[in-house]
Amino acid sequence: MPTVIIEMWAGRTEEQKATVIRGITKAFEEIGIKSEHVQVIIHEVPRSNWGIGGEQASKIFP
């Protein structure tokens, strides 16, 4: 049973997250895995809690 964990910045709409979940599930279906066996977990992280090159992402991408 594949489990895909996505870490991304907070702020996407419910529709956008649903699109990501459907797309990942479809990719697994294309290689023969039933959709009911695919789990997708989205962790939303505030930009202030995400570091890039020693800086907070909220400062790099305001």
Regions of interest found by a model, annotated:
Residues 1-62:
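A domain-level signal for the structural core that forms small-molecule/cofactor-binding pockets
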